[in-house]
From Swiss-Prot:
Coiled coil: none annotated. One of its GO terms (cellular component) is cytoplasm. It comes from Alcanivorax borkumensis (strain ATCC 700651 / DSM 11573 / NCIMB 13689 / SK2). Gene3D superfamilies: Imidazole glycerol phosphate dehydratase, domain 1. Pathway: Amino-acid biosynthesis; L-histidine biosynthesis; L-histidine from 5-phospho-alpha-D-ribose 1-diphosphate: step 6/9. Residues 190-204 have a biased composition (Polar residues). One of its GO terms (biological process) is L-histidine biosynthetic process. Its EC number is 4.2.1.19. The gene is hisB. InterPro entries: IGPD_sf (IPR038494), ImidazoleglycerolP_deHydtase (IPR000807), ImidazoleglycerP_deHydtase_CS (IPR020565), Ribosomal_Su5_D2-typ_SF (IPR020568). It comes from the Bacteria. Belongs to the imidazoleglycerol-phosphate dehydratase family. Keywords: Amino-acid biosynthesis, Cytoplasm, Histidine biosynthesis, Lyase. This is Imidazoleglycerol-phosphate dehydratase. PROSITE patterns: IGP_DEHYDRATASE_1, IGP_DEHYDRATASE_2.
Length: 204
């Protein structure tokens, strides 16, 4: 299997983002976004997904973090789509349950070529380390729309909002790792009865 890494840049009047992902990495992470708690969460994705991430972002944080968080999700999703390529020989589906003390989250995903997000997390407070918890949805929506995956996120229980968020991102990393893992039994075959996992919206 060829090298599965990609770099994407996104420049708008609101943000300037550069994201690099290596799907066959070792969990290395270099982040410079101006958003410490989001960086803490992305570090969990890298370490638990065994992907290397290098993300640099400048945005209109003097307004709020919405544009920057959403655009990081978009740019990382685009890089992921480029890195994973035609998806031949991968497992396609990934899932993970991750606990952290009282919190438990489940993430299930499909490299379907059809973007879809179902996220059910009732955070116990509105801000974690100064980060608006509503923006987690914006990050994942941006990622899903451009990675072209179906993603289900459920926080099954939790009292501490930090623990809720951390279990979600750890489970996301582990589910990604499972989905993109090469399956030796597939031997370069696309894991779909249609023979393609394209962006046409009808892959099964």
């Amino acid at each position: 299997m060829s090298k599965r890494s990609a770099t994407v840049e996104r420049n708008t009047l609101e943000t300037q983002i550069q994201a690099t992902i290596n799907l066959d990495g070792t969990g290395q992470c270099t982040l410079d976004t101006g958003l410490p708690f989001l960086e803490h969460m992305l570090d969990q994705v890298a370490r638990h997904g065994l992907v290397d991430l290098d993300i640099k972002a400048k945005g209109d944080l003097h307004i709020d973090a919405h544009h920057t968080v959403e655009d990081i999700g978009i740019t990382l999703g685009q890089a992921f789509a480029k890195a994973v390529g035609d998806k031949k020989g991968v497992r396609r589906y990934g899932h993970a349950y991750v606990p952290l003390d009282e919190a438990l989250s489940r993430v299930v995903l499909d490299l379907s070529g059809r973007p879809g997000l179902e996220m059910f997390v009732e955070f116990t407070r509105g801000s974690i380390g100064g980060f608006d918890v509503d923006l987690f949805y914006e990050f994942f929506q941006g990622f899903v729309n451009h990675a072209m995956i179906t993603l289900h996120i459920d926080n099954l229980r939790g009292k501490n909002a930090h623990h809720q968020a951390e279990t979600v991102f750890k489970a996301f990393g582990r589910a990604l790792r499972m989905a993109v893992e090469p399956d030796p039994r597939m031997d370069g075959i696309t894991p779909s009865t249609k023979g393609t996992l394209s962006e046409s919206g009808d892959s099964q």
